[in-house]
Structures are given as structure tokens and as C-alpha cells.
Amino acid sequence: NESIAMTNRDYIFNTNEITKKFNLKKCYLLNDWEAIAHSFNYVCDSIINIKEGESYNNTVLYLGPGTGLGASVAINNQFVLATEVGNTTNSTKSLLNNFNIESNTIVTLENIISGSAISNIYKLKANTLLTSEEILDKYVQKDPIAIDVMDGFIKSLAQSLSDLALTFNSGGGILLAGSL
């Protein structure tokens, strides 16, 4: 197929239209997280290392909570596997326990780990809609609901990263990226 539609925005991209408009020989449409993994060599000097470690293979996991939740895996810095991990539901019921929330509805991982998730969970608990930035400010000011939400977010992110690192055997590291 020559077209893709974004899942969290109202955009549709078509390779034929892009090729014609920009007079290109070829046009490849990539998943956003596939592009992020391919860009590693171009941005590696600006990466902030949170924890040093020894690599035991060349598999790197890229994860980014932002508007949604994106992820990809790069093997030997050549083969990139794009994922739609944000749309998965396998572990979400147990992650809701990090926020002391019970739900009978279908919840995706990005409903728990993303900037919009922080806002939505805060609204569920406080009946007030705030941006994730405003909630982080409240967290710094020791607001109990913001603390509960941010602590639940961090626990959920850590648990999910652990599961994904095991799933993809990312012995080359885990890189966090995105707008959050």
C-alpha cells in the first residue's frame, strides 16, 4: 500500500503524492519509531546516559512516551523492527494497580504510559483536566494526587521497560526518546 494513516493524528501520507510533489526517485514511508531507531548514528552525541552498563549484544530498544507510546528495536544498528506496543493490552490491567484504579474497559499501554495518559489519569482521580506539564509542576509542589499519578506512571514505565527489555533481549541498551 502506498498510503499510511496516523493512529493518533488526522494525517494520511501517500508515497505517490510525496514523490511527485518533491520530484523524488523513491519515497519510503516509515513508522515514526522506525525512523528514530535509524537516526541513532546522527544523534548519538546528544544522548544523555542515565546509567552506564556493558553491552552484551547489539540490540537496542527505543521507547518514547509522548502523545502516544512508540517503540522500536534496532539490531546491529542495521535491522529495525517498528512496533505498535502502545496499542497493546496484555499487561494493562495489572499496571492500573500502580494508580489504584480498577477498570472493566479495554485499556491500551499508551492509555497508561504517555503524556496524555498522565493528564487523563489525573482527571480521573482529581476531576480536573491538566496538562502533563502542569501535573509535573504539582508533583514538584508535593500535591498528593500528582504524586500518586507520577509515581504510578514511573512504576508503569519501569515495569514495561523491564518486560520489553526481556522480550527483545536489548543488551545494547534502552533509549528513551519522544516529547515527554
Residue spans of the language-model regions?
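Short, well-ordered, mixed-charge alpha-helical segments that flank or form enzyme active sites
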Residues: I36-S39, L69-V73, N120
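ATP-binding/phosphotransfer module of carbohydrate and carboxylate kinases, centering on a glycine-rich
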Residues: K20-N23, V73, N97-L180
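Single-residue recognition of alpha-helix boundary sites
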Residues: Y42-V43, N77, K125
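Short, functional N-terminal and low-complexity linear motifs
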Residues: I4-A5, V85-K93, A126-L129
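Glycine-rich phosphate-binding loop and adjoining helix at the ATP-binding site
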Residues: E2-T59, K93-L95
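Glycine-rich beta-strand-to-loop/alpha-helix junction loops that act as flexible
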Residues: N1, D32, G64-T67, G171-L180
